[in-house]
Amino acid sequence: EDDLTHYYVATYVTDWGEESQPSDPVQMETVLPTWSARLRVNYYDVSLSAYGITKMRIYRSVTSTEQAEFLYIGEVEINPDTSFTHFGDSSYNLGGTTLSTENYDRPAKGLKGLTQMANGVVAGYFGRTVCFSEPYIPYAFPIEYQINTEDNVVGLASMGTNLVVCTQGTPYLFQGTTSSTMTNARIPVQQ
């Protein structure tokens, strides 16, 4: 039998089902496919309950000749003694759900001016940077959805799926159906 080396990540889950960005990958010991592995989850923090975080989802690496990804293997309640048993067999207990929150970055420190757009996107800013959330996921602000302006931003106004960005210099109009398709153009008027 071939030895297997697996990597694991965990995400926090709130009582509303909101799922966080994953932890850094942790390498599990190399095991034979028929062995079981007991994972000790040491992310417990008393303050988690203040944010409604009640569970952790565990994902395991699965590789093929074309790609590597993390697949869901289970969910555990958060408490000081959380542990999780998983078997080494690559086909055992894989729910098939691929980790989808890898780019769910926290809102940037100092983010302000939060504005809801009609497409479910929340926009905000800090300094010269305009930030956009994942649609309908207002706690996930992927870094790749940040767009810089030439001058410091002073305010935002939503108009449907458009966003007017007021700066200390020239205003901008941001347009896009989703956060990943946002483009901007200067409005040729001094503020």
Positions of the model-derived regions?
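Generic N-terminal initiation segments characterized by hydrophobic and/or small/turn-forming residues
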Residues: S36, R128, R186-V189
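Surface-exposed loop/turn elements that mediate protein-protein interactions on large endomembrane-trafficking
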Residues: R128-Q146, Y172-N184
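Short loop/turn segments at secondary-structure transitions that flank enzyme active sites
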Residues: W16, S64, S90-Y92, R128, ...
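Beta-sheet-dominated scaffold domains
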Residues: V121, T149-Q191
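Disordered, low-complexity "stalk" and linker segments at domain junctions of extracellular
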Residues: E1-F126, P138-E144
